Amino acid sequence: MYLIFDTETTGLPKRWDAPITDSDNWPRCIQIAWQLHDEMGQLIEHQDYLVKPEGFNIPYDAERIHGISTELAEADGITLAEVLEKFNIALSKTKFIVGQNLGFDVNIMGAEFHRMGVESQMSSMPVLDTCTEVTASLLQLPGGRGGKFKLPTLTELHSYLFDQPFAEAHNATADVEATTRCFLELVRREVFTKEELDVPKEYFREFQERNAEPFKLIGLKHINLKAASDKIREQLKALAGEGQQTVVSEEDKADFKAAKFAHLHNHTQFSVLQSTIGVGNIVAASAKNGMPAVAMTDTGNMMGAFHFVSAVMNHNKAASGKNKALVEAGEEPTETEVKPIVGCEFNICENHLDKSKKDNGYQVVLMAKNKAGYHNLAKMASIAYTDGFYYVPRIDRKIVEQYKGDIMVLSGNLYGEIPSKILNIGENQAEEALIWWKEQFGEDFYLEVMRHNQEDENRVNKTLIEFSQKHNVKLIATNNTYYLNKEDANAHDILLCVKDGEKQATPIGRGRGYRYGLPNQEYYFKSQDEMKKLFADLPEAIINIQEIIDKVEGYSLYRDVLLPKFEIPDEFMVPEDEEDGGVRGENKYLRHLTMEGAKRRYGEITESIQERLDFELMTISNSGYPGYFLIVQDFIAEARNMDVSVGPGRGSAAGSAVAYCLGITNIDPIKYDLLFERFLNPDRVSMPDIDIDFDDEGRGRVMDYVINKYGQKQVAQIITYGKMATKSAIRDTARVLDLPLFEADRIAKLIPGMMPSKWNLARFISESEEEVKKALRSDEFDNVKELIAIANEDDLAGETIQQAKILEGSMRNTGIHACGVIITPSDITNYVPVTTAKDSDLYVTQFDNSVAESAGLLKMDFLGLKTLTLIKDTVKLVKYRTGIELNPDTFPIDDEETYALFQRGETVGIFQYESPGMQKYMKDLKPTVFGDLIAMNALYRPGPLEYIPSFVRRKMVTRKSNTI
């Protein structure tokens, strides 16, 4: 006997390898059908049952597939206990259980038997499956795993065996009928072996005699489950009096009319390769639309938080100034000031530490009410990367509970916990989730409703509104924006293709042969009028937005730089420092180290030297950063103790006599008349910045020393943001749109090698020809003119340029600053959010170098220089071969043979003098004194580069150069 069966369920399991005893993992059975056939293929029994959903709902996504609604199953189904009893009787009559990909159905029914505590022999019965490597080899469909043939679907197998299509009905009775036909035909064709069927050899001959023709469907009439669900739902609506138009009170109408809309769920370019919106653009758009606030809620990170708050503050300062001038002139103010709301769309999973299985979690929006809330967001955003990263940055409910202070929550988009459970698991589970969030956040928890004209969204919104009324949770209207204007939708879709390495021609959908994409073009930054029109029947969703705005306190993320505590000897400590946080003791100790160093450097300290040192020490004291110098001299001294080569000094720090006396630099600024004011200006006190060169092999050891001294959680590297440059935007767009490679390359080469300041692709296209011509050299202008002509063509090349101009500047990836290192007084996550590096255990700040100091971070530049390693290795080799011990610090700077090398341009391996351009100018200049090398180093950079020929000519005619 053969029992062929199939089930329809509430969805898919989280883990396919979970045991049937894991009841929470396996979905529920809501329909089962079976056919019992004898060994010759004759039908003995056919049964089909809907199962009453007891204690659960059938989620919408499951209903959309098979058509069985909760209402239909409750009306026409029988209890699970009855179903299991009948199924057990059928199992007792058969030798084999049969199905298409039967393992899933066996687990579903096994889990149901376990839930009900019913014994069954099913799990020990032999299985015959129509979806195996054998049937895959029969059909030989490409695309399987590991280069094998693809496992066939029921439709594919049916079409192969009978040369006629079968549309998988996702109705258990229809699927069982088709599976039975395929199975019996496979038996007739002897695809199953006698060993598998446990039959004698003559069985197949007898089976084929009884069934000489290919098997046919038995002709069952299948119920249209979707139509049946729709019918019963309409009947229930009629009984409940639903379908009547929503009545909005006059009071709500008045409040709605006066209410201001603000976007509270927005993604910027810091949602890497997911949004085309720049931070400045979203602030400008909010102000332009008269919105009182705007939130930034990027996916999984807070990289843009500082830039966002700063952009809003700068806008508000300008708007306030303009409004003040208008009021003073007797006119009405015209500018809108905007309140920034910092948030993050977190991925909240079951256990953020569990990396044994993929669990990207649910997307839920958390927003800060104030500075304390911001720091809690930063903590969570940091943990999401440092502890929870697995495919995506993740946190879990325990982390939310720990850092929930001063936080507001929006329930999120369709991937949020509550909406997702409504669609995929069931309304009961969604309601349980809502209760948890409300228990944690009370009146700071809001249900988020979106209207993008999507069927699944409409279904979710209906349930959310019911939940809102039942649990007294307020609704908030959002639009989950990813691009600024509706016409940017195509460019955004191209960006998603760039992220996933897809062609835009690939259809949007799930599974093999499809790609990810938004379902329509409604995810743009809509105006107040557009949003109010969408929610005219649900005015409270707009009115409630002001409540969130009012809860947010204004705050700045700017702060003074915080230095880690540097331990100074007891004799230099000043008691008052403990009381008021002063740095008197550090100043005393710095003066002591400086004067001791001055004795070693100068021997006799003349009045002019003392005067210079006093001036510098006073300026350093006034800056409030003596600790900075103590920290730097400490790790440089340790580097030398570890035999790590340290550079003699680079940049403006070489102008400091204090730095020279401390051993930070090896250049005497007094001897070379270098200006201290370029390093620290007493009239404009700012954080000093010292670039320190180490040999590239020893840099890591110095880093380890700093980490051990200050603590691993107090040291971090600095993130960099990789932007999509003009040529990159063109090439990426061309690949997605399938523009031929040679054509894309030709267009990209029309872009100037070095873009003029404040120019980009969009400006080239929009500006007048005269303005473009002013910004470019003649040859560059000709190329750009051709580029503009192509952009204005109505073809694929023109479309590529037009879309690329929108994508240009989008963040493409993140990296790590080559030399920047942050040191903080305590755990760095107390100050800024962090992420992690792929090849290092060190934290990486989510804020980049452009805002690190403004955010209060002490930044050091630890540069690894290969040149220092070469010098160090050369010194060792000379000693090894000749016994002569060289000291590079004592090499003369007037050696004629060395200048001869420079004059011939033989400077490969000499830092900052080895480029082909520099070698050419060395040959022209023919340097003879150290001052020539200094001058050329200063000239060889953008700006003064054009004056090099003039400088060379003046030297050649021995005329005194003017100061440049």
Where do the PLM segments sit?
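Structural motif
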Residues: 2, 95-97, 262, 293
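Short, glycine/acidic-enriched loop or turn micro-motifs at the edges of active sites
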Residues: 9-11, 104, 132, 178, ...
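Glycine-rich, highly charged phosphate/nucleotide-binding loops
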Residues: 75-84, 426-430
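Alpha-helical scaffold/interaction cores of sigma-54-like transcription cofactors
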Residues: 232-964
